[in-house]
A protein has these predicted regions:
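N-terminal Sec/SRP start-transfer signal
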Residues: 1-31, 35, 247
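Hydrophobic, regular-secondary-structure patches
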Residues: 25-100, 123-127, 140, 221, ...
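Peri-transmembrane interface segments
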Residues: 37, 41-44, 216-261
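Short, surface-exposed amphipathic charged segments that create phosphate/polyanion-binding patches used
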Residues: 97-103, 249-253
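Short beta-strand boundary microenvironments
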Residues: 99-142, 146-149
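Basic-flanked hydrophobic alpha-helices used for secretion and membrane insertion
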Residues: 114, 133, 139-237
């Protein structure tokens, strides 16, 4: 995997490596593989939708937004559906490379429909507080099966006073086009937020499914204008555009990608 190449080049600076790779992961996760990242610069973006709008902190990629932002989003015309997401980020570099745990709304698979999961696993996500739907690629690499327990040591403090988290594999998700997107696990944001001791009531991003690309542009503008002067200003736009902007803030990603070929 390409993360191995990144690790070899940066392993001596572990803190810088962690921050750099996590920054790139957030941007690249919207596309999954280096081939797709490269296609950003040719205009041939696979698996993305102009109707999917990302809302995230304006000035800090790793910042948080209050969950209360969704109250305004719910009132906007043209919003077909939306979901919230946060990240359970592993402290250790090695475990981070194994995948990221996404804490999301249970309707994740309705809004982000380039991912698919069975009805049974989605029901478990809603009813079992410890349930996790694991990416098929990660499950295959680790030999995971339904009922297995996965463990991670993360940056969020658990109610037991530790940074240790565990989840039960309730099913598997697949990506319609980009298999690299299957390196992760999805858990229920509500139960995660209830269990963590810090940063309660916050989210990393909001994804909106707009009724059309045109409606999406209007929605993005209204959201950013609404929170422009608040302590939690937003940056909103189509997922493809947001990924390009995030990648551009980190480095010349096209140069990085092409250097591996």
């Amino acid at each position: 995997m390409y993360w191995t190449l990144v690790k070899i080049g940066l392993i001596r600076k572990r803190l810088r490596t962690f921050l750099t790779i996590m920054s790139m992961f957030i941007a690249f996760a919207l596309y999954g593989t280096l081939n797709t990242v490269s296609s950003i610069f040719t205009g041939a973006i696979e698996g993305t939708s102009a109707e999917n709008i990302i809302v995230m902190p304006r000035y800090d990629m790793f910042g948080k937004l209050p969950y209360s932002h969704v109250q305004f989003i719910e009132t906007l015309d043209g919003v077909e559906d939306f979901m919230v997401m946060d990240y359970l980020i592993s402290d250790g570099l090695e475990s981070m490379m194994d995948g990221v745990v996404y804490a999301t709304s249970p309707n994740f698979f309705d809004v982000y429909d380039r991912f698919e999961a069975s009805d049974e696993s989605i029901l478990a996500l809603k009813t079992n507080p410890n349930a996790a739907i694991v990416g098929q690629l990660m499950a295959d690499q680790k030999g995971l099966k339904i009922g297995d327990i996965i463990y991670t040591k993360a940056n969020s403090l658990n109610t037991d006073g530790s940074y240790n988290w565990s989840f039960e594999v309730a099913g598997f998700y697949t990506a319609k086009q980009i298999k690299g997107d299957e390196m992760g696990a999805v858990i229920n944001w509500d139960t995660f937020d209830e269990a963590r001791m810090n940063q309660k009531g916050t989210i990393g991003m909001i994804m909106i499914k707009a009724q059309s690309a045109e409606e999406g542009e209007i929605i993005s503008q209204k959201i950013d204008e609404r929170f422009m002067n608040s302590s939690y200003a937003t940056r909103s736009g189509p997922e493809s555009m947001m990924a390009v902007e995030m990648a551009g803030e980190i480095a010349d990603v096209e140069l990085i990608v092409n250097s591996f070929w």
